[in-house]
Swiss-Prot record:
CDD domains: Macro_OAADPr_deacetylase. This is Macro domain-containing protein VPA0103. Belongs to the MacroD-type family. Pfam families: Macro. SMART domains: A1pp. It comes from the Bacteria. Signal peptide: none annotated. Residues 1-170 form the Macro domain.
Length: 170
């Protein structure tokens, strides 16, 4: 069984190799966890994001991820994952699966052993938490990610409970 733990708390306090950010396609900060990570990381993170090549302002398409330095965070990297806006995609599940998979693939490719993850797309992007938790657990349980210590940081007791239920189902 893969090493997955659940924490109710602030992802910006995680001491890990990589922190996954629930980013937007521009990668320039925003609300929720994205804004919190950018504020905690300081100017080095926004500068690293500006250095990522863009096409018409898009640095990371939906369902994909990019890796940058972590600035002032207690991590080596920030992995910016762009999940789906739930009601804007015909198949949001596939996009969310891809965002988690690309994040974990980048973690492995950059020799990370520990990763902190948020509930991608569950804030302003409107993904139902129960469905998102099922998708996240299904991806994280894949054998190719067995070497990673994955820690989900969840912002409320309700979210923690939803993720605990999903974890026990897998």
């Amino acid at each position: 069984m893969n090493a997955i733990s659940l924490v109710q708390g602030d992802i910006t306090t995680a001491h890990v190799d990589a922190i996954v950010n629930a980013a937007n396609p521009r990668m320039l900060g925003g609300g929720g966890v994205d804004g919190a990570i950018h504020r905690a990381a300081g100017p080095a993170l926004i500068n690293a994001c500006y250095a990522v090549d863009d096409v018409d302002g898009i640095r990371c398409p939906f369902g994909d991820a990019r890796i940058t330095e972590a600035g002032n965070l207690n991590a080596r990297y920030v992995i910016h994952a762009v999940g789906p806006i739930y009601d804007k995609f015909a198949d949001p599940k596939t996009v969310l699966e891809s965002a988690y998979q690309r994040s974990l693939d980048l973690a492995l490719a950059n020799h990370c052993q520990s990763v902190a993850l948020p509930a991608i797309s569950c804030g302003v992007y409107g993904y139902p938490p129960q469905e998102a938790a099922e998708v996240a657990m299904a991806v994280c349980q894949r054998p190719e990610y067995a070497a990673l210590d994955m820690r989900f940081y969840l912002f409320s007791e309700e979210m923690l409970s939803i993720w605990q239920h999903a974890l026990t189902q897998h």
